[in-house]
């Protein structure tokens, strides 16, 4: 089009065509810079669970934790720590999200006290019974509503259900890479939109790279989470935490695909203890070996 104008039109027409092209080029460049911003927008999922010292018992086929206090899921503290480290290194922000009732705000306040910028509670009566798939759909909906999220961090698993599926399922619903069991975050290139991590495995560690955005689950070998600071605790205590419903996330009826119709206590086992004595260590060892062979343990 420009060459045709140069051949047939006046020089004023040609100059206008070149000038218009320059404007288009600058607009595209600016748009690209917006898409590849240098800061990171991070989400971390946290859950309110019974204290790790609590004992689960079955009462009338239902799980009962007694009067155990509620705490932030210990695995999620490692996820919060990982998220905060990346935010600090990349001029980013961290928003904590929890799904549950009013008491779940305590887990969010713990995350705020550790250093998270914001917190959001997703609560709805329809979420009284959830499995990992429902949890993942709600979490993915919250991430989509926030918009422009680069990284989502989750703990390895929750200590009350121990499924360890939420990170992978959330990544699948978002269409993002799932980087699970992360021990080290080696590099994040905000310009190239890539991340490199080390994953824990029985065979050792694997180095994996992926495109952003991505979902990560963090294991405790990542490093000890920081303690909430005094100023952080004060700030968190005054924080107004917004509450989103399923309607806010444009999610319809969510039905769990897995149900727990009944929970049973394991049968009681009778355990007896016998002290083996002898005049010498060799005699004791021989007696122990005879008993092990007699019981066919080996």
Where do the model's predicted regions map?
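Aromatic (phenylalanine/tyrosine) cluster motif
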Residues: 7, 19-21, 25
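N-terminal glycine-rich FAD/FM-binding segment characteristic of electron-transfer flavoproteins
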Residues: 25-26, 32-298
């Amino acid at each position: 089009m420009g060459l045709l104008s140069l051949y047939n039109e006046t020089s004023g027409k040609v100059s206008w065509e070149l000038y218009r092209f320059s404007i288009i080029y600058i607009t595209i460049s600016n748009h690209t810079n917006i898409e590849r911003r240098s800061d990171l927008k991070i989400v971390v999922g946290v859950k309110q669970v019974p204290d790790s010292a609590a004992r689960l018992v079955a009462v009338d086929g239902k799980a009962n934790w007694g009067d155990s206090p509620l705490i932030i899921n210990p695995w999620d503290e490692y996820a919060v720590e990982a998220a905060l480290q990346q935010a600090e290194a990349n001029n980013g922000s961290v928003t904590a999200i929890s799904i549950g009732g009013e008491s779940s705000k305590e887990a969010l306040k713990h995350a705020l006290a550790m250093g998270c910028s914001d917190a959001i509670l997703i609560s709805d009566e329809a979420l009284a019974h959830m499995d990992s798939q429902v949890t993942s759909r709600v979490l993915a909906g919250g991430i989509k509503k926030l918009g422009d999220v680069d990284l989502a961090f989750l703990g390895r698993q929750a200590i009350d259900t121990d499924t360890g599926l939420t990170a992978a399922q959330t990544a699948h619903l978002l269409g993002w890479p799932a980087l699970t069991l992360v021990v080290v975050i080696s590099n994040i290139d905000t310009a190239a939109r890539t991340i490199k991590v080390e994953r824990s495995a029985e065979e050792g560690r694997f180095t994996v790279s992926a495109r952003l955005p991505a979902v990560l689950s963090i294991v405790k070998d990542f490093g000890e989470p920081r303690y909430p600071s005094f100023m952080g605790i004060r700030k968190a205590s005054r924080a107004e935490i917004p509450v989103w419903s399923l309607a806010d996330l444009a999610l319809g009826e969510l039905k769990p695909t897995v149900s727990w119709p009944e929970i049973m206590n394991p049968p009681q086992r009778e355990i007896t203890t016998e002290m083996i004595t002898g005049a010498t260590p060799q005699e004791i060892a021989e007696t122990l070996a005879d008993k092990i062979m007699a019981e066919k343990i080996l």
